[in-house]
């Protein structure tokens, strides 16, 4: 992670790939990273490739992170009009978390549908998305 100042605001920005569970998972490196990452009064912004641990398994309630940007689920890859995403490997059919803004613990997650596709599966009814946010604290 890096500590910086943006428009006069003290900010800590970091990134992680995995599920970000509170208990040791794999080699415990994610937990060591997050324990150090949250030890600040700065605005904490985390880039997390995988949203499921933070949203489905509620680990964002454990980690004191203000804002998370995530992707990984590609907006559900295939979207059913007026319904939403068709499938996510973690949630199954008609998943709740495919894109959007979600309150989690004491923070917020912005889940982007992104630009790419997964494993060569074409995007259907699912426009590519780049998220632009104004952060006001």
Across the structure, where does each feature detected by a protein language model lie?
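Binuclear metal-dependent hydrolase catalytic cores centered on His/Asp/Glu-rich metal-binding motifs
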Residues: 3-48, 52-58, 120-123, 128
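Conserved beta-sheet core of the metallophosphoesterase superfamily
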Residues: 51-131
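Short beta-strand-to-coil "C-cap" segments at the C-terminal boundary of structured domains/repeats
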Residues: 133-137
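Short acidic-hydrophobic surface loop/beta-edge motif
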Residues: 1-8, 100-105
């Amino acid at each position: 992670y890096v500590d910086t100042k943006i428009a006069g605001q003290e900010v800590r920005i970091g990134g992680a790939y995995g599920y970000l569970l509170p208990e040791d998972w794999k080699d415990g490196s994610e937990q060591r990273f997050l324990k150090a990452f949250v030890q600040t009064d700065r605005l904490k912004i985390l880039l997390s490739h995988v949203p499921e641990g933070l949203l489905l398994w509620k680990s964002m309630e454990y980690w004191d992170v203000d804002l998370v940007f995530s992707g990984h689920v590609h907006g559900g890859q295939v979207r059913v009009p007026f319904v939403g995403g068709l499938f996510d490997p973690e949630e199954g059919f008609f998943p709740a978390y495919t894109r959007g803004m979600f309150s989690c613990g004491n923070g917020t997650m912005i889940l982007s549908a992104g630009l790419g596709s997964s494993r060569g599966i074409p995007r259907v009814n699912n426009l590519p998305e780049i998220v632009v946010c104004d952060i006001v604290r």
